[in-house]
Amino acid sequence: MPLGGGLKSVPNGLNPPSIKLVKWNDVFGVEITEKEINRVTAVAEETMAEVIIGIGGGKTLDTAKAVGHHRNIPIIVVPTTASTDAPCSALSIVYKENGKYSHALWYPKNPDVVLVDLDIIIKAPIRFLIAGMGDALATYFEARANQESDSLNYVNYEDGGYKRSQAAMALAELSYKILLEDGLKAKVAAENGVCTTALENVIEANTLLSGLGFENAATAGAHSIANGLTALPENHKTLHGEKVAFGVICQLVIENRPTEELHRVIDFCLSVGLPITLEELQVEATLENIRIIAEESMAYTWSSEPFSVTSNMVYDAIFATDKYVHHYKKSMFT
């Protein structure tokens, strides 16, 4: 039973004549909410679906995972973009009707099958690939924060999680290295509709490496900022990974990491076109908005940082990040 959202038709490999498909391309809405999950789950129940196939972007795939979990049926995900690390993860991010972050649903297992077709991915708007780099960019820095705080990961999360492995840290770091080395090359290739080794590497980093990395090492400040941004309606037009990229810089600022590292991340974001100021995220840089983001972000994973974080610290970090990036960009042309 395919859950549409990314393709006009089901790929031939998923549509053999011996299998009856019940398509609901027009059923899934724009937002993944509890109401939407329950509605689509009802469709799966009514049609006695034996398999759920999610074809589309991150929210479509997260919905498919939720439906498959509720119905206890196998889950196949077919991402049509490389915009997030959702395809491989054992969770779904649920939002409220107004687009604000609500909560996460945690599952005992990952999707049964993840099919990534490069011919499909490279046809997606370039913005999605870039946003995926923003999401993957956070994996290493958040893993490092969790390592320094000795926090538990997201494996079997509802029972408390486990200590991260060295393999998880290696995957997270590899994801970051691939972005720095191949990110810009991948963007140029995708813009011109060709598939290169660099593009393949970045798609792997965005989906597999980042997905395994964040689940097995957990998130921290960057995703807290991203979720805090969803409290502002004007920011809802931006993609998850775009929010996360700004969150990465805020996290580095609040951690007071070396200037060289901060500049390396800013330079990468600028090179691929990730938004890294509030204005670029369609948010007016008012003190009130910054306060809202900071306070909303406290409900998430700042506790994974290696020190106690307060909303005032986050407020200062957001303000400083926005001003610093503006200053840095101006200095490039003087």
What name fits each language-model region?
Residues 69-167:
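A glycine/threonine-rich phosphate-anchoring loop and its flanking beta-alpha core
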